[in-house]
Regions:
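A conserved structural/catalytic subdomain of Rossmann-like adenosyl-cofactor enzymes
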Residues: 62-191
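Conserved S-adenosyl-L-methionine
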Residues: 1-78, 83-91, 95-96, 103, ...
Length: 191
């Protein structure tokens, strides 16, 4: 979803065939841990003629941020796994994924992540530490509260958090909070 949508948007903004070719070959990168989801994502990109699926079947958290930064990403989109973090495995908290994504982007890059609302508060000590590091090194621009049925049947209240990478959050910064729960859509189960 994210890569396909991003590719289509970028292609619509491109003026020349050379720009379109460059977008398809060099400007889209993705990481997927699960091999079955990786296969679906790669097939979708190939079917949409992306030219070169820069997808990797790997653990994104094992990638060194400096290594990923060399790809020159100016936008990061992420939907990390929900509710996987524990005291024994704090690296799996959503805030850990957010911090790693932001650290992996270029200076001034923008990131949008969709996570459970509860993860943004950071309840555990580990989550509080991730949150502190994020705010120390990056700026939270705003949070959009989504419809509770965005992920039908999951029972979570999703939000989209928007960040600017590598610009420390100013304590006087006014963040935008948008309530988009009434998005005008009606959820119909598997219709």
């Amino acid at each position: 979803g994210f890569l396909i949508s991003a590719m289509h948007r970028m292609l619509m903004m491109a003026d020349t065939d050379a720009q379109k070719k460059n977008i398809k070959k060099k400007q889209l990168h993705g990481f997927e841990l699960q091999s079955n989801m990786f296969a679906v994502a790669a097939a979708n990109m190939i079917l949409r003629k992306d030219g070169n699926s820069n997808l990797e079947c790997c653990d994104f958290l094992r990638k060194k941020p400096a290594q990923v930064q060399m790809k020159g990403a100016t936008v990061g989109l992420m939907n990390p796994p929900y509710s996987q973090g524990t005291k024994a495995d704090p690296e799996q908290y959503e805030l850990s994924f957010i911090e790693h994504l932001l650290d992996s982007l270029t200076d001034g890059a923008r990131a949008a992540v969709i996570v459970p609302q509860s993860s943004m508060t950071g309840k555990s000590k580990a989550e509080q530490a991730f949150k502190k590091n994020i705010m120390k090194n990056h700026t939270l621009e705003g949070v959009i509260t989504c419809n509770t049925d965005t992920f039908y049947g999951v029972g979570t209240n999703p939000v989209i958090a928007v960040f600017t990478a590598h610009e420390p959050h100013d304590a006087d910064k006014v963040c935008k909070f948008i309530d988009f729960r009434d998005d005008g859509y009606e959820v119909r189960a598997h219709v």
